[in-house]
């Protein structure tokens, strides 16, 4: 299946000059969603992954089905104040400024092999922050998996040393 045909391009969103890649049509189409899940799962099958981690919000949408297919758990990473239990946090760099991410303190056990699943790799800021958070609490980031990669933003360059999969690549 050509997932590129299932990704809607919305010009000038969220601001003028941005060509937004919308994954909603994938989520709406059960065959496209199954295909996406299968492709990520196939990539991870032989990597001995113990747990899937996904950043809010679209990382949840793609990470949970992958975890289900691999018969392993899923751990959400969220913005501050959204998780009800004790958390660990990390500050990470954005294009303009910084932000913070949190994970439950019991979300990952020391030494677990983690795959991070998200919808988009752009500048690499968010996934770099998630990776640091996983490593800070003792997990090993074994793979980074994305539905879409915006290659011209060079997020991959920030993630040297990580095993990266992206299903659809766009040049801006």
Curated annotation (Swiss-Prot):
Homodimer. Catalyzes a salvage reaction resulting in the formation of AMP, that is energically less costly than de novo synthesis. It is found in: Cytoplasm. One of its GO terms (cellular component) is cytoplasm. It comes from the Archaea. It holds the Pfam family Pribosyltran. The keyword Transferase applies. InterPro entries: Ade_phspho_trans (IPR005764), PRibTrfase_dom (IPR000836), PRTase-like (IPR029057), UPRTase/APRTase (IPR050054). Keywords: Cytoplasm, Glycosyltransferase, Purine salvage, Transferase. It comes from Methanococcus maripaludis (strain C7 / ATCC BAA-1331). It catalyses: AMP + diphosphate = 5-phospho-alpha-D-ribose 1-diphosphate + adenine. One of its GO terms (molecular function) is adenine binding. This is Adenine phosphoribosyltransferase. The gene is apt2. GO terms for biological process: adenine salvage; AMP salvage; purine ribonucleoside salvage. The keyword Transferase applies. CDD domains: PRTases_typeI. Belongs to the purine/pyrimidine phosphoribosyltransferase family. Its EC number is 2.4.2.7. Pathway: Purine metabolism; AMP biosynthesis via salvage pathway; AMP from adenine: step 1/1.
């Amino acid at each position: 299946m050509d997932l590129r045909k299932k990704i809607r391009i919305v010009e000038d969103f969220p601001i003028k000059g941005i060509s937004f890649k919308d994954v909603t049509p994938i989520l709406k189409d059960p065959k496209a969603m199954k295909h996406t899940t299968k492709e990520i799962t196939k990539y991870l099958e032989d990597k001995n992954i113990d747990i899937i981690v996904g950043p809010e919000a679209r990382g949840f949408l793609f990470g949970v089905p992958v975890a289900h297919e691999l018969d392993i758990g899923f751990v959400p990473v969220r913005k501050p104040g959204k998780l009800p239990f004790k958390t660990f946090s990390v500050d990470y760099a954005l294009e303009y400024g910084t932000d913070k991410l949190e994970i439950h303190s019991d979300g990952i056990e020391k030494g677990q092999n983690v795959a991070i699943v998200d919808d988009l790799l752009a500048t690499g800021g968010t996934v770099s922050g998630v990776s640091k958070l996983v490593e800070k609490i003792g997990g090993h980031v074994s793979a980074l998996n994305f539905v879409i990669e915006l290659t011209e933003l060079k997020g991959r360059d920030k993630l040297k040393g990580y095993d990266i999969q992206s299903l659809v690549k766009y040049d801006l």
